[in-house]
Amino acid sequence: MRREERQQHARETTRRAILDAALELFIADGYTQVSIRNIAAKVEYSPGAIYSYFPSKDEIFFALAEEGFHLLSGPDDPGRREYLRSLEPVDRIREMFWHVYEFSREQPQYFALMFVDRYVPRISREYERFAFVRDMKHELIARIQECIDAGDFPSTLDAPVACRMLIMGVLGVAAMQLSDRLGPPEQADVLARDVLNTLLCGLKSGVSLQSRDTLCAVDEAASRATVS
């Protein structure tokens, strides 16, 4: 390995150690209670060394959130894409939202940081960096619109509102399970499945919804940037 490669490898290893330590501290103590000094002490570096990798604690959060949302979106897997295409429209939606719940089980620390801690910075501050998150949301909405166009859902259904309801349903169960407010994990899985199926059945039945579409944080920031 050449000198430049060794240096790059060492830098990547150090950066990873900082992120891992920060994630652990953010989850254990809460974002607002953690300082750069705390992170430095955990990885046995000086605060100045941490700043040479990340200019602020917020930047550490954004790096972790970016990793988390990429984990949620998953790799570009042709096999999974083909599997989703093979499903009926409503089953495709069910599978896509169930994947969000599974993420909470497979990556509980990232999930807690991204969706549970209310004091973390808003990703809308870095809307260009997180544009792919907006694309993920729009993909879900597009799949719901397919169901509307196919007649599986009533034509009066607002796809963005339906998306918001479904995501809140699975995130709610996931957050309760993560905070140990439910029974054993198997019960949480059953509850999450029941919530998802009940919401889908309600949408198919044409139940009257009072909710209205609202822009998510990243959409709102992007809209402001476009206007300016």
Model feature map: region roles:
Residues 70, 76-77, 124-150, 160-164, ...:
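Amphipathic alpha-helical packing segments from all-alpha helical-bundle domains
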Residues 74, 94-116, 134, 138, ...:
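Helical hydrophobic small-molecule/effector-binding pocket
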Residues 78-109, 159, 163-166, 189:
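Hydrophobic alpha-helical connector segments
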Residues 13, 17, 21, 25-59, ...:
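Helix-turn-helix
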Residues 1-13, 207-228:
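N-terminal intrinsically disordered/low-complexity leader segments
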Residues 101, 157-178, 187-199, 217-221:
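Hydrophobic alpha-helical segments that form the core
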Residues 31-32, 153-154, 182-183:
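Conserved hydrophobic residue
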Residues 105-124, 175-179, 215:
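Amphipathic alpha-helical segments used for helix-helix packing
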